[in-house]
């Protein structure tokens, strides 16, 4: 068991999602309002991905807004990034160094992804 597993497990429980042990290196959570949250461990990094499908007519504006906000470092204190999957799925993500991972940092990263998503999707 990795030393960060209890942190990830506690984070998932805080979101109301029970976990089993041992944790998979890829955890996928369906969020009712914000799409799919994935937590992926790779090397010494934990990446949080927040993906949401959009209606075709919102894609171009959302893509430009997401890339502008993340490129301008207006996304908060963590290095948030934006991308696109397929034809209509907005993906916002942040990679965290496992050595500095704490439960508050994990919550902060998730909250910043949610805020960025709200900014991107705001009219």
UniProtKB/Swiss-Prot annotation:
Interacts with YscB to form a complex which specifically binds to YopN. The lineage of its organism: Bacteria, Pseudomonadati, Pseudomonadota, Gammaproteobacteria, Enterobacterales. One of its GO terms (biological process) is protein secretion. Pfam families: Type_III_SycN. It is found in: Cytoplasm; Cell inner membrane. One of its GO terms (cellular component) is plasma membrane. It is a peripheral membrane protein. Disulfide bonds: none annotated. This is Chaperone protein SycN. Keywords: Cell inner membrane, Cell membrane, Chaperone, Cytoplasm, Membrane, Plasmid. Its main location: cytoplasm. Functions as a specific chaperone for YopN. It could facilitate the secretion and the subsequent translocation of YopN. The keyword Transmembrane does not apply. It comes from the Bacteria.
């Amino acid at each position: 068991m990795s030393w960060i597993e209890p942190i990830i497990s506690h984070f998932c429980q805080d979101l109301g999602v029970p976990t089993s042990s041992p944790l998979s290196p890829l955890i996928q959570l369906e969020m009712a309002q914000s799409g799919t949250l994935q937590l992926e461990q790779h090397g010494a990094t934990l990446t949080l991905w927040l993906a949401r499908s959009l209606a075709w007519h919102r894609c171009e504006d959302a893509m430009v807004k997401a890339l502008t906000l993340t490129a301008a470092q207006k996304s908060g204190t963590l290095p948030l990034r934006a991308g696109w999957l397929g034809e209509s799925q907005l993906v916002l993500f942040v990679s965290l160094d496992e050595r500095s991972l704490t439960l508050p940092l994990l919550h902060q990263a998730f909250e910043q992804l949610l805020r960025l998503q709200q900014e991107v999707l705001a009219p």
